[in-house]
């Protein structure tokens, strides 16, 4: 099956492909201030070809979201070595970092560029224990494609994203609008084809909808005219506005995982992991690293709860229908979970797009 990841295979020179005429996948450009809790995960590593040499790599891998000052939520396949090697080699000296920069195009896999100026080292990362890339299913299924990064230092100037509470869960229904963010492809291409220059590695956002809702996953962007996620958007968020007593109505409800069917990014969009289903696992991993003293920030060891008032009880200053966040992922797929996962090109990176207004009249 195809994941929305772009890891290593862009060495066929993006710069040489200059046809940028096709329409982007229905999103709009975003800045670092739009959905400021979102970021890109980059990887530096040595890929060994099993006796046939080795190659140094440094590349953007996945989109992602800050859920605590030092914790980043993303897809499990973004940090699974098998997603890069497919068993044909090994990764060593792996260095993962997280950046909020809107332009990560220098890290498209064609060169070893300097780290982004704001890049923070991840000291630890973990995949869900039931994740198995070789057993992935297409459509809306149960794949457990979710993981965490733990940062060396906390990000204290950005409000993290909040997950759905138990009471808010019932608001997640088919037809609900979701805002998506990612650094992935803006133009759908064939699996082995590099995206046109200027159409990958830039932060994008847009509004789509939940078209099919399962117990553990949901489908986003069912039609070709919808905002759709693509390679590079893997790990990235889907946000949904909820009715709540909280002053922050935006909730992180999905993590971009994989394409819906064989049409890849071209027509039917992608599938997200439902975040709230895994809330207990996420919180347990967060608390465990506070209990053993390894986390960088433990003012609140577990999942953060959306505030009901500003510090000091001040009024929010926002009017009804205004977004207090300021505007806060497609892989190729197949009926055979591993069919189409050609080694190292476009595997990790679902990205979508998200508009500035999470709150709107519906």
Predicted segments, located by residue:
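Boundary/junction segments of secreted and surface-exposed precursor proteins
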Residues: 6-35, 291-305, 309, 314-320, ...
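Conserved catalytic-core segment of clan PA serine endopeptidases
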Residues: 18-33, 54-56, 84-157, 161-169, ...
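Glycine-biased strand-turn-strand hairpin within the trypsin-fold
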Residues: 33-67
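C-terminal subregion of chymotrypsin/trypsin-like serine protease catalytic domains
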Residues: 60-108, 198-211, 229, 237-321
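Chymotrypsin/trypsin-fold serine protease catalytic domain
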Residues: 142-228, 275-280
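Extracellular Ser/Thr-rich, low-complexity/disordered mucin-like segments
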Residues: 322-339
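A cross-kingdom C-terminal cell-surface attachment/processing module
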Residues: 339-357
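Cytoplasmic C-terminal tails of single-pass
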Residues: 358-362
